[in-house]
Amino acid sequence: MSFELDIGHTSQAGRNEVNEDFAALVQGQGRDRERGAIAAIADGVSTGGKGREAAQTTVNTLVNDYFATPDTWDTTVALDRILSAHNGWLASMNRRRQPAVGLTTLTAVVLRGQSYTLAHVGDTRAYLLRGGRLQLLTTDHVMAQRDLAHQLTRAMGLDDHVVVDYSQGELHSGDLLVLLSDGVHGSLPERELRQLLLQPQDANTPSAVGAQALSEEITRAALRRGSTDNVTALVVRVQGALEATLQDESRRAQHLPVLPLLKVGEPVDGLVVTALVADSGVHRIYQVRDPATQRLYALKTLVPARAHDAQERATLAHEAWVARRMQSGHAAVSYTHLRAHETSLH
């Protein structure tokens, strides 16, 4: 299935003279296509008019530099390296320019392979709509006291070191990801947001509203609700997913159960064990047979005692990922049909 996105972006100053929100999305092209896409939204906070600059430079730096990081880096590592460096630069600029200070929130999501990776600082938000259920993916970094409800506890450029919230999850075709500034989510109840996202295009068209139309309607609804801040919405509908990446496989391997010690004749995900070939104390290799074709295969597993070893799980996933990509008459070929029935780690 090809990786296709329907993208919508609307940003307005609202009742303010200056719009200090900024958002962008970049999708990999050519050799970078396998890197997926990155979307980000930022809400600048300033004294002296530097909020817009902070928001714009933070988003542009992240979405452009992401594709320059090594492909072998985990997505969270790539994002953290970029954000740490940019935060240090922004904090240094703020010290030199005081009292004119520019801070910004940031919520960014990378859509890669069959997963998403989220990075978050401040009170911009990310939502995921899947199967009719709207889920908030971020936590607002604001003071708990009622009279200081809008005072940020974390922001890009506030200190030399920034603590970024990272999270990852599976990406499904049909998912709708929505990034919002606080000018939107502070006025628009989640119940109403969900209703907007679920609305059909019209009575005669069962297909969903396009992402651009959704982003426009979300910001209009926030203004109708009395928002006095800038309003920005970035909407991304996933219309297809890429092939699983090594990162996807490694994350998946951490959750699959490890097989018990198997005996000859026992079934394993549609195969039948015919012999124990090797036992290293860490791994076991079994000979297994496909009853449908009578073909024999080798099946490698972790011993139960190493079930909690995250590194061994990741290594086994790495070996399987490499094997599926090797096309050689001199190397073992992965039995890809088994993946459709895989319920355990092997």
Model regions and ranges:
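PP2C/PPM-type serine/threonine phosphatase catalytic domain
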Residues: 1-298, 304-318, 325-327, 339, ...
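Conserved HxN/HPN-centered segment at the entrance to the catalytic loop
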Residues: 327-335
